[in-house]
């Protein structure tokens, strides 16, 4: 089973997105293949700011990959540079984040895991997208490459 965390700062947009994606999982009968959960980014790695919410514990072992809202770029870099992250994290491209459907999200997570397993360091990026926040695509990287051919 692929376990995916959807992360943002306060949870306003990503918790709604995670709920929407979980409905898609159920509608497509994918619950046995994919587990998707919203986890605020600070709670993912037990950052001190998580004391505010009372959830100061590292939750990285609960998921295989964390897909982050685009606005977390600098927070993610700080956490990686501090050595606090031991799972692959990926910043979703802005347009994909806004229009994401479950199939694109699953493909993105699978491909990020493959890159990570092949030695790509955090923050994981695709070779042709060194800064994913700048990507203009609205589909998974896999589909975007296929459409470009």
Regions found by a protein language model. Give the residues of each.
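Mid-chain, well-packed structural core segment of small domains
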Residues: 64-103
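Ser/Thr/Gly-rich flexible loops in soluble cytosolic domains mediating phosphotransfer, phosphorylation
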Residues: 87-142
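C-terminal output/effector regions of signal-responsive regulators
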Residues: 143-149
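Hydrophobic, Leu/Ile/Phe/Ala-enriched alpha-helical segments that form helix-helix packing faces
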Residues: 21, 25, 29, 83, ...
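Glycine-rich, often proline-containing surface loops adjacent to acidic residues and nearby aromatics
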Residues: 1-3, 88-89
């Amino acid at each position: 089973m692929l376990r995916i965390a959807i992360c943002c700062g306060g949870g306003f947009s990503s918790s709604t997105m995670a709920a929407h994606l979980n409905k898609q999982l159920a509608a497509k009968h994918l619950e046995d293949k994919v587990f998707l959960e919203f986890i605020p980014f600070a709670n993912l790695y037990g950052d001190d700011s998580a004391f505010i919410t009372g959830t100061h514990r590292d939750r990285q072992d609960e998921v295989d990959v964390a897909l982050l809202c685009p606005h977390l770029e600098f927070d993610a870099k700080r956490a990686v540079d501090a050595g606090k992250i031991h799972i692959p994290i990926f910043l979703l491209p802005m347009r994909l984040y806004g229009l994401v459907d479950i199939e694109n999200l699953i493909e993105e997570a699978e491909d990020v895991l493959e890159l990570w397993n092949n030695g790509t360091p955090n923050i994981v990026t695709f070779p042709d997208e060194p800064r994913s926040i700048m990507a203009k695509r609205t589909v998974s990287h896999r589909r975007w490459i296929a459409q470009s051919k």
